[in-house]
Amino acid sequence: CLSGLLAEEGDYPVAFDWPRGDLNVASAELAIGLLTLLHKPAGEDDWRALWEGRGEGDLAAGIERLAPFFNLLGDEAGEGPRFCQDLDELAGTPNPVEALFIDTPGANGQKKNSDLLTHRNRFPALGLEAAAMALYALQQFAPSGGAGNRTSMRGGGPMTTLVVPNA
């Protein structure tokens, strides 16, 4: 999953292109967090070098060091930690994959047929990478109350402002 951030010399990713805006924002926030961990510029000159694209060698090595934390399937035997997933046994009945999106109506909304603007069964399946980003976005943006999800680490709600400075 992280190896997609590494590219051939001169051909670096410039944007995320998920089919949903919330996944693009979650990806950008995750990338900002990773870069914050991997690059700790000491001063303005170091920041300028990073902005101008110098010193990417350390970035590739750092991403490789973090790769085990983003494992989606566990180890070779299918055991061990997985990205954004609990190690405890799951209880209850499984939810459809579209429940990973915070705008999906819950069981009560579907029972009352109040899901007029957000249709049910929009996403019958997701690829592995999309499912991982949807899981991360849910854990990053989950509001309080509602469908039985824990509130996100920032207290609920996906209100975010990302500023791109002009060079």
Regions inferred by a protein language model and the residue ranges of each:
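Conserved small-residue
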Residues: 1-167
